[in-house]
A protein has these predicted regions:
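Terminal substrate-recognition subdomain of acyl/acetyltransferases
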Residues: 1-35, 82-85, 135, 142-216
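Hydrophobic alpha-helical core bundles mediating ligand binding, dimerization, or RNAP-core interactions
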Residues: 42-50
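Active-site rim helix/loop that mediates acceptor-substrate recognition in acyltransferases
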Residues: 50-82
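Short, high-confidence coil segments that cap the C-terminus of an alpha-helix
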Residues: 75, 135-138
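Conserved beta-strand in the GNAT
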Residues: 79, 85-96, 107
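Short coil/turn motifs at secondary-structure junctions
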Residues: 95-97, 116, 148-150
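Conserved acetyl-CoA binding element of GNAT-fold acetyltransferases
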Residues: 100-115, 144
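Conserved acetyl-CoA-binding loop-helix of GNAT-fold acetyltransferases
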Residues: 117-134
Length: 216
């Protein structure tokens, strides 16, 4: 599946209006989760998200305790905020190359968004990640999403269509870093100089940690 020319835990409600119309004058920030309170807020968001997925019969990781991962001060986690409210959390890392990908990349691990949010949140993360990768001289962003069934089956097919509309390429499926079957995603890095008017990156140039298999 290829993307047209120019969210991640699993299902999101489709966006019905444009960014500008839905969030006029909104100020977003991506920053490292540095305090115990921020890390606990991220863990609670993950728990809410996993509960939301479970109630809808959608997959959650079978092996890893993801909330505990976000509570761990040794995890280099980040959050997307709007006026101080945490909208999403993730674990970005510099990766020398996943088993299914060639070459270095920015790996977006453990992406979780607030339940019942529009696709705009995933789109913000997509824009931010592609710009961050470019600023770190990395050619690609890679991510994985759980996919227990064929990629052509719903609801994963609808999610992948929305992600390809945002610029992601689907690179097939296979075992993920924790052994679950996943869909493999790639995004081309792209400098976006005007993005700072929408998203402030308050991460001190985001000195990405090297890949650590314990924090997938």
């Amino acid at each position: 599946m290829r993307r047209p020319p120019t969210p991640l835990a699993n299902e999101e409600a489709p966006a019905s209006t444009s960014f500008a119309a839905k969030y006029p004058g909104a100020v977003y920030a991506v920053r490292t989760l540095r305090t115990d309170a921020e890390r606990e807020e991220a863990a609670a968001l993950v728990q809410d998200r996993q509960r939301w997925l479970t109630l809808r019969g959608l997959p959650v990781p079978a092996q890893a305790d993801v909330p505990a991962l976000f509570r761990d001060p040794h995890t280099t986690s980040a959050g997307l905020f709007e006026d101080g409210k945490l909208l999403a959390c993730m674990v970005p890392a510099r990766d020398p190359g996943l088993s299914w990908g060639e070459g270095p990349c920015l790996r977006l691990g453990r992406v979780h968004t607030l339940p019942e949010q529009p696709d705009d949140i995933t789109r913000l993360i997509t824009l931010w990640a592609s710009d961050l990768a470019a600023r770190q001289s990395l050619p690609l962003v890679r991510a994985e999403i759980l996919a227990r069934h064929a990629l052509q089956a719903e609801p994963i097919a609808a999610l992948l269509r929305r992600l390809t509309d945002m610029g992601w390429d689907v690179r097939g499926s296979g075992p993920g870093r924790e052994g679950d079957r996943v869909a493999r995603l790639e995004l081309t890095a792209e400098h976006r100089p005007r993005l700072s008017t929408l998203i402030s990156c308050q991460t001190h140039a985001f000195h990405l940690a090297a890949d650590d298999r314990s924090t997938a």
